[in-house]
Amino acid sequence: MMNQLTHINASGEANMVDVSAKAETVREARAEAFVHMAPETLELIVSGQNHKGDVFATARIAGIQAAKKTWDLIPLCHPLLLSKVEVQLEAIPAANENETNMVRIESCCKLAGKTGVEMEALTAASVAALTIYDMCKAVQKDMVISQVRLLEKTGGKSGHFKVEA
């Protein structure tokens, strides 16, 4: 684990990191999020019966748009020229009464650049989850968004990171 916060200067003030001297490398990051819901809500999504429209298509586009706007949402993020943004959604019915029905969201962002795309991947997964909540809140308000996390990142000075299985 790094022991220095890169966005804090010697005076303790928040600053945008200067990446101008860094070499361009291919960088990629994957993130995930889950939306837990009632079986009836998941069935509305899967069957395409949600009155607001195609939940997965809307969440996918929202996640892609969010990744592209991360620099506008997170104050010290750099505007990036993303070469790839992918958002995948999977309906996961509960296997037994001890589990919940859920949607798993996985995002992937990629570029050739001077800074990483972890925040873009996390933002894509988060906003896709929020969009699912928004589109389904009329039928269920107690859905839970959980486990928003970075799964893997490659490229850059810190190298390869992957969550242990």
Curated annotation (Swiss-Prot):
GO terms for molecular function: cyclic pyranopterin monophosphate synthase activity; GTP 3',8'-cyclase activity. Keywords: Lyase, Molybdenum cofactor biosynthesis. Its EC number is 4.6.1.17. Pathway: Cofactor biosynthesis; molybdopterin biosynthesis. The active site is at D134. The keyword Lyase applies. SUPFAM superfamilies: Molybdenum cofactor biosynthesis protein C, MoaC (SSF55040). It catalyses: (8S)-3',8-cyclo-7,8-dihydroguanosine 5'-triphosphate = cyclic pyranopterin phosphate + diphosphate. One of its GO terms (biological process) is Mo-molybdopterin cofactor biosynthetic process. It is an enzyme of class 4 (lyase). Substrate binds at L76, C77, H78, M119, E120. Homohexamer; trimer of dimers. Catalyzes the conversion of (8S)-3',8-cyclo-7,8-dihydroguanosine 5'-triphosphate to cyclic pyranopterin monophosphate (cPMP). Belongs to the MoaC family. This is Cyclic pyranopterin monophosphate synthase. It comes from Photobacterium profundum (strain SS9).
